[in-house]
A protein has these predicted regions:
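Positively charged n-region of N-terminal signal peptides that target proteins for export
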Residues: 1-6
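Bacterial N-terminal signal peptides
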Residues: 7-16
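N-terminal cap/lid segment of alpha/beta-hydrolase-fold proteins
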Residues: 22-61
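Short beta-to-alpha linker loops that shape the active-site pocket of alpha/beta-hydrolase fold enzymes
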Residues: 74, 102-107
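Alpha/beta-hydrolase active-site loop
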Residues: 112-136
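A conserved short beta-strand
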Residues: 162-169
């Protein structure tokens, strides 16, 4: 029995040592690369309680007191030109303010399953975005996720009590 206990202790220690955290240096490189290229919206820094992360807020043409938090896919950023930028800008034509946020990311060679340990970082980021929007007076808040952002949004909703009014993923 003592042998099993020792093995479990060693395994628990090994898993703890291998736990990954978001690649904050890569996040900063993305932020530096895109900050001056934003044509629609304003960049901002949000804080998840441990670190600052990039957000891009874009006001709707018509002020309808509703906002969408947009979450990108694996390894990219909150202004990804192929999907996220058209979504965050296009929704403003339909009365939605958008806040596209930097989700936790890993190095370029990381595969999809390697992201699982980062899911603990998801709730603080989404909560920071929700809190910002509430402080700005938005009452109706929805989450929209693409690819890994969809999975992270699903994980968030399954594990957190929230008053967001919708989810598209």
């Amino acid at each position: 029995m003592k042998t099993i206990s020792n093995i479990l202790t060693i395994l628990a220690f090994a898993f703890t040592c291998n736990a990954q955290a978001s690649d904050l240096a890569k996040e900063q490189r993305w932020a530096d690369a895109i900050e001056d290229t934003i044509m629609d919206g304003e960049t901002m820094l949000l804080n998840d309680g441990k670190s600052d992360f990039l957000g891009i807020f874009t006001e709707a043409i018509e002020d309808k007191n509703r906002a969408a938090i947009i979450m990108h896919g694996t390894g990219i950023h909150p202004d990804w030109q192929q999907v996220i930028n058209p979504l965050r800008v296009g929704l403003t034509d339909h009365g939605w303010h958008t806040l596209s946020i930097q989700m936790p990311i890993l190095a370029n060679d990381a595969e999809y399953p390697a992201y699982a340990p980062l899911y603990d970082e998801v709730a603080p980021r989404i909560n920071a975005a929700i809190n910002y929007l509430k402080e700005e007076g938005y009452k109706k808040i929805v989450l929209i996720g693409h690819s890994q952002g969809s999975t992270m949004g699903t994980y968030y909703l399954a594990n957190n009590k929230t008053d967001v009014t919708g989810f598209v993923g």
